[in-house]
Amino acid sequence: MRLNFLVTTMALLVAFPPPYECRAIDSSSNQPVTDPDEERQSPAVLARMGEEYFIRLGNRNKNSPRSPPDTYPEASQYSKRALQLQLTQRVLEGKVGNVGRWDGNYALRALDSEERERRSEEPPISLDLTFHLLREVLEMARAEQLVQQAHSNRKMMEIFGK
């Protein structure tokens, strides 16, 4: 069985080689360096591509090595903007519990609880109306989800016993 799997895998790898983008970078010293600017640009492009890849994945691997943001300023500018957009999407979807943990150059700052209370007490102006309504809908959806979760937990406790 294992031999059959090994032979099939080898046949597929020979028949369908991975695309050029998936192959390792050729680091042989036989090729002459033509332009020093080109040599400096390639790490920036690779860093940018890697950051975009981790942003798309949601950076699930927190221990992954990251390049320092000051190393490639143009790459860090794109990554900052992408992380801001990602955080905004997560906040709007209600997936971020504590926005303060994203504190830094890459994220939005959390509002103080007093400012949140003041905003909820004041009637929203026309520009904030959309966000006010969105916030209300998200709060209602969260409350409904908690009620449903509590109901399902009660059912499970009744079925399995206390």
From Swiss-Prot:
Keyword hit for Secreted: yes
Modified residues (Phenylalanine amide): 160
Signal sequence bounds: 1-24
Gene Ontology cellular component list: extracellular region
Location in the cell: Secreted
Any one Gene Ontology molecular-function term assigned to this protein's record: hormone activity
Annotated InterPro entries: Corticotropin-releasing_fac_CS, CRF, Urocortin_CRF
Residue ranges of the propeptide: 25-119
Superkingdom field: Eukaryota
Keyword annotations from UniProtKB, A to Z: Amidation, Cleavage on pair of basic residues, Hormone, Secreted, Signal
Pfam families tied to this protein: CRF
Primary location recorded for the protein, binned into one broad class: secreted
Function text: This hormone from hypothalamus regulates the release of corticotropin from pituitary gland.
Similarity-based family: Belongs to the sauvagine/corticotropin-releasing factor/urotensin I family.
Protein name, as recorded: Corticoliberin-2
